[in-house]
């Protein structure tokens, strides 16, 4: 059996789970998530625990077993605690601000870059060089963080750009311009 897939998910008090065929609906204090799981996976909700079982032991079902369990766990964690991703802006004059619901980035282009979050996502700018993304859907939070990072990825020479908090940028040594033989 899958080591991750066989672990049951404990559903905390205040979280409602509805299973309709392969569609799972999780409702909690932070919001609601609905996700379509693979039709072959068997999902049961009994005694305040979610259990995922697979119909066969072939390679496809073994890989789907752990995936389905992790997706369900992310849904439960999302509606109870939520997910957060933090970004940092590194570079002279690089800054972020909020205009209404939009995130406005000044990252060295001739124009400011505006990014509007999807419904259910919240962007905060605690400092001009810090961005915080919060939401109940881990996939959407990560996708928005990746889209913001892609606006100006960190470059390897000076490390300027938008990076995840705690991300280590592999640095390169620049050219040794004009220090060779003549």
Swiss-Prot record:
SUPFAM superfamilies: Ribosomal protein L6 (SSF56053). The keyword rRNA-binding applies. GO terms for biological process: cytoplasmic translation. GO terms for molecular function: rRNA binding; structural constituent of ribosome. One of its GO terms (cellular component) is cytosolic large ribosomal subunit. Keywords: Ribonucleoprotein, Ribosomal protein, RNA-binding, rRNA-binding. Gene3D superfamilies: Ribosomal protein L6, alpha-beta domain (3.90.930.12). InterPro entries: Ribosomal_uL6-like, Ribosomal_uL6-like_a/b-dom_sf, Ribosomal_uL6_a/b-dom, Ribosomal_uL6_bac-type, Ribosomal_uL6_CS. The keyword Hydrolase does not apply. It comes from the Bacteria. This protein binds to the 23S rRNA, and is important in its secondary structure. It is located near the subunit interface in the base of the L7/L12 stalk, and near the tRNA binding site of the peptidyltransferase center. Part of the 50S ribosomal subunit. HAMAP family: Ribosomal_uL6_B. Belongs to the universal ribosomal protein uL6 family. NCBIfam families: L6_bact (TIGR03654). This is Large ribosomal subunit protein uL6.
């Amino acid at each position: 059996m899958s080591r991750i897939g066989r672990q049951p998910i404990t559903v905390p008090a205040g979280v409602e789970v509805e299973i309709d065929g392969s569609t799972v609906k999780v409702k909690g204090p932070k919001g609601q998530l609905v996700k379509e799981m693979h039709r072959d996976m068997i999902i049961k909700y009994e005694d305040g625990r979610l259990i995922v079982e697979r119909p066969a032991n072939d390679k496809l079902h073994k890989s789907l077993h752990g995936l389905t369990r992790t997706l369900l766990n992310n849904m439960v964690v999302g509606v109870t605690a939520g997910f957060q991703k933090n970004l940092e802006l590194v570079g002279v004059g690089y800054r972020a601000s909020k205009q209404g619901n939009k995130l406005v980035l000044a990252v060295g282009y001739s124009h400011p870059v505006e990014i509007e979050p999807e419904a259910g996502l919240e962007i905060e700018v605690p400092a001009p060089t810090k961005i915080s993304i919060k939401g109940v859907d881990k996939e959407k939070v990560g996708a928005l963080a990746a889209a913001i990072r892609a606006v100006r990825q960190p470059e390897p020479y000076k490390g300027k750009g938008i990076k995840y908090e705690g991300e280590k940028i592999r640095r390169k040594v620049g050219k040794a311009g004009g220090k060779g033989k003549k």
